[in-house]
Amino acid sequence: MARPFPIQRTSIVREAGKKWFVVDASGKVLGRLASQIAKYLMGKNEPTFFPGVDNGNYVVVINADKVLLTGKKLDKKMYYHYSGYPGGLKQLTARQLLEKHPERLIYLAVKRMLPKAALGTKYLKRLKVYASDSHPHEAQKPQPLEF
């Protein structure tokens, strides 16, 4: 007896080899840079992109201390963290964070653009941010990215 409907087959997207990219953040606007980095971390630039499969790449960001913020965001934008104790809410302006920990500014911007689930944590582990123009990932031969 013949089947009235053909059997549907589902193809599974396999994880491909991860590529390494290096991005120079000097003179780039923070939000525009972070959205492009998030796209590469998730693998949305690949033709084999599938939302439930981790096909993302590694991204190394250099010169994080030379990133730009438009308008008055350097003085008006606040970053908060809480220690868990009463009176333990700490706040820094973007200027203070850029002076103390410039790599954390880009890290937080990209983190907030990634999914808030388990895959987002995997993506974030592949982000490497450095304040200077040198990084320890030369052995991976990262390809330069221009945005």
Swiss-Prot record:
- Matches recorded under InterPro entries: Ribosomal_uL13, Ribosomal_uL13_bac-type, Ribosomal_uL13_sf
Q: Give the matching Gene3D superfamilies.
A: Ribosomal protein L13
GO molecular function annotations of the record: mRNA binding; structural constituent of ribosome
UniProt protein name = Large ribosomal subunit protein uL13
Asked if Ribonucleoprotein is a keyword of the record, the answer is yes
Q: Which UniProt keywords apply?
A: Ribonucleoprotein, Ribosomal protein
> Whose protein is this, by species?
Pseudothermotoga lettingae (strain ATCC BAA-301 / DSM 14385 / NBRC 107922 / TMO) (Thermotoga lettingae)
Keyword Cell inner membrane present in the record's keywords: the answer is no
Which gene codes for it?
A: rplM
What is the taxonomic lineage of the source species? Bacteria, Thermotogati, Thermotogota, Thermotogae, Thermotogales
GO cellular component terms attached to this protein's record:
cytosolic large ribosomal subunit
**Known Pfam families for this protein?**
Ribosomal_L13
